[in-house]
Amino acid sequence: MGDRRRTGPTRRGELWFAATPGGDRPVLVLARDPVADRIGAVVVAALTRTRRGLLSELELTAAEDRVPSDCVVNFDNVHTLPRTAFRRKITRLSPARLHQVCRTLWASTGC
């Protein structure tokens, strides 16, 4: 399922396990494709299995999105991580799901 040859994210819509202070956690890469390869820090949104029913959450399913378990992307937890924090690629979201990511991010930020 993962691509172990890469050392960090290169494309928006990729899901990775990344080192965080709380241990390795799944994240969604939000950085634009031309930028993700060239900068030292990458903009990501955290994934969690805890659903709160918020406007700022987008549900992902194991069946449709090839994630290890059903979860949500939490756009209230957007931050940057150094490229060196990325451990293992999980999958890449489909273009249709990536469109939903952008719509949910827009709805959650209001801009």
Language-model regions: role of each:
Residues 1-111:
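Conserved functional hotspots at enzyme active or ligand-binding sites that engage polyanionic ligands
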